[in-house]
């Protein structure tokens, strides 16, 4: 298992309190394959550096998890299928 950080930017029209529960259903992919979710940190509404899908701001969330690479790839694929998710970025902390 490897450690990952996933940054998710969601549509700013969503309610901030609904972000964590909506992400939780996607996190079941990680849990089902034996991975663990360390934390889900919702940063709230922030301004984007440039417009993405005609949005000048978005709701940021950072997810720290441990999982196999194939599981994280499937998790990211499912997130990108959701229309309310503007952008995702998967990172490996200290992977050098």
UniProtKB/Swiss-Prot annotation:
One of its GO terms (cellular component) is ribonucleoprotein complex. The keyword Transcription does not apply. GO terms for biological process: translation. GO terms for molecular function: small ribosomal subunit rRNA binding; structural constituent of ribosome. Signal peptide: none annotated. Gene3D superfamilies: 3.30.70.60. It comes from the Bacteria. It holds the Pfam family Ribosomal_S6. Keywords: Ribonucleoprotein, Ribosomal protein, RNA-binding, rRNA-binding. Belongs to the bacterial ribosomal protein bS6 family. HAMAP family: Ribosomal_bS6 (MF_00360). Binds together with bS18 to 16S ribosomal RNA. PANTHER family: MITOCHONDRIAL 28S RIBOSOMAL PROTEIN S6, SMALL RIBOSOMAL SUBUNIT PROTEIN BS6M. This is Small ribosomal subunit protein bS6. The gene is rpsF.
